[in-house]
A protein has these predicted regions:
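Cell-envelope and extracellular/periplasmic
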Residues: 2-247
Length: 247
């Protein structure tokens, strides 16, 4: 995902995560949770490895874990009582197209392909993050995906549903499982200024419309969790736990 998936338990500068102090202090109670944070790599060519290591949940490490990912994993660990491994590729400001292949974008019907392939930054050029951050970990066995992205696709909200459907097909194919669960987060309310004032609700609508076209999927509602003046809402525990309830 992008920055709301990236946001660590310790929060961003002047943007805290609610309950972070207790979550960090209690992390030693969950030694079966481990997280693998994929380094930010934007690559023109497909990669098969990355420079990172698994981290065990401890008070010293959890502050840098993805907050949504950690709270998701913590809920699963409490419910199942088995080790939980979380692989988290994320890049703030990234577009959905960067996490897809050019071929997958080209094969998506009914979209504005020129706009979809118009990204110019490392985290928005099509296929760059798929090459550098998804392919290196797709040989791991996985039980499912969680996804928190969409703010950076306000410019082409009208194509977001179709692009998300294509992304899910692509990722499931990469893992060799056409039924792998895909659970994602509704974008939380936030007041963008200017011409984009209406675009965020339209992305949210596209997210809900995608449910009907993505089997084995679910969405975690966040209408009650947003902050109209902060794009990174503090209540990440609820987001992670709602995704876990879907799982």
């Amino acid at each position: 995902g992008q920055s709301n998936m990236e946001m660590p338990v310790s929060g961003f500068m002047f943007q805290p995560v609610e309950g972070a102090v207790d979550a960090i202090a209690d992390a030693g109670m969950y030694p079966g949770i481990r997280m693998f944070t994929v380094p930010r790599v934007s690559s023109k060519t497909p990669l098969d490895d990355c420079d990172a290591a698994w981290q065990t949940a401890t008070p010293a490490s959890v502050g840098q874990f993805s907050a949504v990912g950690y709270f998701f994993g913590r809920m699963l660990y409490k419910a199942l009582g088995i080790p939980v491994g979380l692989i988290t590729p994320n890049w703030g400001g990234s577009t959905i197209e960067a996490w897809m292949t050019v071929d997958a974008i080209d094969a998506t019907p009914g979209i504005d392909h020129a706009v979809a392939k118009s990204g110019t930054y490392d985290n928005s050029i099509p296929q760059r993050l798929y090459n550098g951050m998804i392919l290196p970990v797709c040989r791991y066995t996985a039980k499912g995906f969680i996804w928190y992205q969409g703010e950076s696709n306000r410019r082409n909200w009208y194509d977001y549903k179709a692009l998300q459907v294509s992304l899910v097909k692509l990722w499931r194919n990469a893992w060799g499982d056409a039924k792998m669960p895909f659970y994602y987060t509704q974008l939380a309310p936030y007041r963008y200024e200017g011409d984009t004032l209406r675009s965020l609700p339209l992305v949210i609508e596209a997210q809900y419309r995608a449910l009907a076209e993505i089997p084995h999927s679910g969405i975690a509602a966040t209408t009650d969790l947003g902050n109209p003046t902060c794009i990174h809402p503090a209540r990440k525990r609820e987001v992670g736990e709602r995704l876990a309830f879907l799982a």
